[in-house]
Amino acid sequence: PAEHAIRGLRGIALWVEDAAGTAQVLSEVLGHEPGPVEGNRSRFVHPGAGLGRIVDLRAVPGFWAGAMGAGVVHHVAFRAADDAAQAAATAALAARGIRVTPQQDRTYFRSTYFREPGGVLFEIATDAPGFAIDEPVAALGSRLMLPARYEPHRAAIEANLPRLHPAHDTA
């Protein structure tokens, strides 16, 4: 039912060897405000309303770093209102000696990527142009939309996706 639909994530938890550099990037570059500290967990909150504003940062010396595989998160994405906000973040990162990828056009948004000092891969993605560039807002999520470069591979992509059964689907 719609009342049980996933509408977003409350926040994320990052476990890093040394949290100091990550904390600086979160607060000085990405605009998160330091919040309460409990033991080895420091909370950072992005100002404003909505989901995805909380980052819980844990300093866990000696913790085994993640390895790619099923169930492992590849990267964490943060929002940038537009190209100018993304460029400002990129400049702030470069001033700290952090290498950032060139901007990547992902059709629905534009992204840059960097490894923050704790080793986690971060993405900064623009809000624009948005997911309504190739279908009406009312139709979002009703069928699989693909960027033009992936359309030739639609059959193979769809063959590898599990069938979803939306609440309104009686099949």
Language-model-detected regions and their locations in the chain:
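Short acidic/glycine-enriched loop/turn segments that link adjacent beta-strands
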Residues: R106-R110
